[in-house]
């Protein structure tokens, strides 16, 4: 019996998980998504071509791999259908859990209306309806992908719920759709998606029993976890390693190696605490060189120095075995680089991740920078200062480096 390996974002998302998943895919039979929705963007560069995916697992670029969207994902059928249209011959190699919840148009309208109402206190969601879809799931009023197989019944249930909540929608200035429009849309969803809806939990159990190799592609980052992240500025699902179990129907003993993905610096989209944020020329330089604009929203990402305290916390939460250091080349040419090694909280130096992260000040260690590393494929060929930087990150986070990315291209990666 085999185990499922995990790739987990260890910061606030956008770490570069897609590249590592794509690089490792050839060694696996299955690639799965276990949580999140189309708020998460996966970007892969192959032969200079950029592929941006939001729901479909990154393994879809390999025709011999079976790709699964698990029950923990909230699925927007419109987005999924448009994304699937980019790829050929999906039947038999792409499946959606019948238990995954639907993220429909009214969810995004609610999301956007609530964010507008909060004004300057807005969380900074993507406005894609992820939170409202998960809220319906927890409230036991949501609808699942399997219900698309009976669009007549699903339409009746949705219209009944719209009527029951008419005052709520009116207060948010959201117009309730006509029944015929809802039915026609659900019918279209069924016609396109029905061949791909399956009992993916049983499928994965059988795969592991048959010693197939399974890779789970995490969405977003550990610091956005609904329980362990910088609440309330978080996402609506569990993004740490344990979320893969509930999001796919796996047992803890089914989990094998856990690989954490970290950038050589730190980024964050939206509001919330960010101790090592660099609101200066260096942060702007990271943003421009690293092309730090969201795959999903196009929003400019906030940039800052590597935060070893945050990453050490993420590593412990997910039991990370080794990490992949991404975008090291973005720091090429920096005369000095910094690492946040601790925090100052109420005058005291701490080395742990507190609940009130917004109250801390960063404590930095400064190191000498390096010249270009772009395209380097051997650790020994890296400049000495770049090697020192990596080793210092290993020491501070209690993890070992397994991969070092030296450019966006798939092959420009040092494997240790």
From Swiss-Prot:
Requisite cofactors: Mg(2+)
Record's protein name: Adenylosuccinate synthetase
Residues engaged in binding Mg(2+): 14, 41
Binding site for substrate: 295-301
Any Pfam family: Adenylsucc_synt
Chain coiled-coil ranges: none
Chain sites annotated for binding IMP: 14-17, 39-42, 126, 140, 220, 235, 299
Enzyme type, top EC level: ligase
Active site: 14, 42
Quaternary structure annotation from Swiss-Prot or TrEMBL: Homodimer.
Cofactor note: Binds 1 Mg(2+) ion per subunit.
Disulfide bonds: none
Family the UniProt entry places it in: Belongs to the adenylosuccinate synthetase family.
Gene Ontology annotations of biological process type: 'de novo' AMP biosynthetic process; IMP metabolic process
GO cellular component, one term: cytoplasm
Keywords per UniProt: Cytoplasm, GTP-binding, Ligase, Magnesium, Metal-binding, Nucleotide-binding, Purine biosynthesis
Binding positions (GTP): 13-19, 41-43, 301, 327-329, 405-407
Domain of life: Bacteria
NCBIfam families hit by this protein: PRK01117.1, purA
Function: Plays an important role in the de novo pathway of purine nucleotide biosynthesis. Catalyzes the first committed step in the biosynthesis of AMP from IMP.
Compartments where located: Cytoplasm
Pathway: Purine metabolism; AMP biosynthesis via de novo pathway; AMP from IMP: step 1/2
Gene3D superfamilies: Adenylosuccinate Synthetase, subunit A, domain 1, Adenylosuccinate Synthetase, subunit A, domain 2, Adenylosuccinate Synthetase, subunit A, domain 3
Molecular function via GO: adenylosuccinate synthase activity; GTP binding; magnesium ion binding
